[in-house]
Amino acid sequence: MTASQRTLMVMAGGTGGHVFPGLAVAHRMEAAGWRVVWLGNPAGMEATLVPKHGIPMEYVRFGGLRGKGLKTKLTLPVNLLRACWQSLGALRRVRPDVVLGMGGYITFPAGVMTALSGRPLVLHEQNSIAGLTNKVLAKLAKRVLVAFPGALPHAEWTGNPIRAELARTEPPQARYASRSGPLNVLVVGGSLGAAALNEVVPRALALLAPGERPRVVHQAGVKHIEALKANYEAAGFAAGEGVRLVPFIDDMAAAYAAADLVICRSGAMTVSEIAAVGVAALFVPFPYAVDDHQTTNAAFLADAGAAVLVQQRDLSAELLADWLRGQSRASLAAMAERSRTLAKPEATDEVARVCAKAAGANLEILQ
């Protein structure tokens, strides 16, 4: 690190919904000449993922309380005090000019110690319903940013930082107009898959006449690919009959861009990516998400006519088949165009600019 180089500390962990947007901002700041250090949990996915991106790490051990037993709750004061001490040590070693909190349990002790040490704290909430940690830390932060309007009071709506290739996708009008033939449907359950989609979609397609069926790419989740193959076989589909089954998709930008319709869950990053690309979506929120935030995430697009929201309890093969019969490429293109108008494709740059400004940096460095 040079004497004039500024440092950003990103604190995020636990799930990809926190880590991936943090990485997008981290890379943007590195491109602008900043040093970036990541604060995470040694037991979290970030401990494996972040070093692969060449970003050095500091660690704090701290877990959540939701669904945990009595022992965890009784030891909370000791664990919290230890996490605060570890956070303070990391802050003293790294000496960041600004700290960006992207969520995860470690954000609470690290965020508190950031504020108490007098360093500027910037918070970003990815979901439409803010978690408890960000609700508390928002009172201590210098700037508060949200991906969905209204998630936190007095916050700035920046959108979710996403991968650059998603924001560069060709506009939906041009993509849809260039296609003919059956609709292209992408089914995505996330990296772990979604059992409800894996079960219902094959049966729904079987209810459609051959001439009504779309072409389908169905991402199963690595652990569920064999079960998904069995589901399609049970529904009467032989391999290669207009259906391609994959365990994981590396290039989501290309997959979204090739689709007329995406059938998926409605995690914060999924909703933000779909809007950024501009593609029609049928959202089936995960019914056990904390505070049912996936329903509210999906409603952001659905309420504007930019997507369709179906609760898992209402989803059936018959309902899905009937709905698919009523869709055309033109109707889906209109939905996709509305979705694109609600996107925040410059979110990564905007969050980076806010961090720079909070540190007192010249914004020209991020232009």
From Swiss-Prot:
Q: Which CDD domains match?
A: GT28_MurG
Q: In which pathway does it act?
A: Cell wall biogenesis; peptidoglycan biosynthesis
Q: How does it sit in the membrane?
A: Peripheral membrane protein
Q: Does the keyword Cell cycle apply?
A: yes
A Gene Ontology biological process term: cell wall organization
- Keyword terms of this UniProt record: Cell cycle, Cell division, Cell inner membrane, Cell membrane, Cell shape, Cell wall biogenesis/degradation, Glycosyltransferase, Membrane, Peptidoglycan synthesis, Transferase
Q: What is this protein called?
A: UDP-N-acetylglucosamine--N-acetylmuramyl-(pentapeptide) pyrophosphoryl-undecaprenol N-acetylglucosamine transferase
Source species = Burkholderia orbicola (strain MC0-3)
